[in-house]
Regions:
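Active-site substrate-recognition segment that forms the wall
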Residues: 1-125
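C-terminal lid/capping helical subdomain adjacent to the catalytic/cofactor pocket in oxidative enzymes
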Residues: 121-171
Length: 171
């Protein structure tokens, strides 16, 4: 049997248990979802100079941006999210009715060289890694799955995966 580890930010803990260490770190992104904000968007709006994105969601408006590298169990600093909401009201949506909302963080698995780890686990037979995609995990997941499937089934992947090896240099 074969095992694929694709566990996001928690992959580091699983890998440590089988003797593999890679410099995987959580990259926390801050979000605020505001219901009844008075802002109606039909599509996401990037405020590049402010460093955040405004997205229409079922519950209303999501304002997201700012990231920090911190341990998984670090206490969130929601002041970061509050600053984004204030910027959105001041610079984009002066008519925003409400600025309070549901705050949360999303942890994304981040590698110091920004490349994911895709391929066999070094020194452990029948274990394959698909981790460290950062903010692009959901976007890159299907392609990564196809690449890992090709390797597991003995086929040549359509991409040279040398840069994505777990035993590469990260400096």
């Amino acid at each position: 049997s074969k095992l694929v580890i694709a566990a996001g930010c928690w992959a580091g803990r699983l890998l440590k248990d089988i003797g593999i260490r890679i410099p995987l770190a959580p990259l926390h992104g801050y979000h605020t979802d505001i219901a009844d904000s008075g802002v109606s968007l039909s599509r996401p709006v990037l405020y590049a100079s402010g460093g955040f994105v405004n997205t229409p969601v079922e519950s209303g408006l999501r304002i997201a941006g700012t990231v920090e590298i911190a341990p998984l169990d670090a206490k969130p600093n929601f002041r970061r999210a509050e600053i984004l909401v204030k910027k959105a009201k001041r610079n984009l949506f002066p008519g925003m009715k409400r600025t309070d909302g549901s705050q949360w963080i999303g942890a994304r698995p981040f590698m110091p060289d920004t490349l994911p780890v895709i391929g066999p686990a070094p020194g452990v037979e029948n274990v394959w890694l698909a981790v460290g995609h950062g903010q692009l995990g959901i976007t890159m997941g299907p392609t990564t799955g196809k690449l890992v499937n090709a390797m597991i089934t003995g086929r040549l992947p359509v991409v040279d995966l040398t840069p994505y090896r777990a035993d590469r240099s990260y400096v």
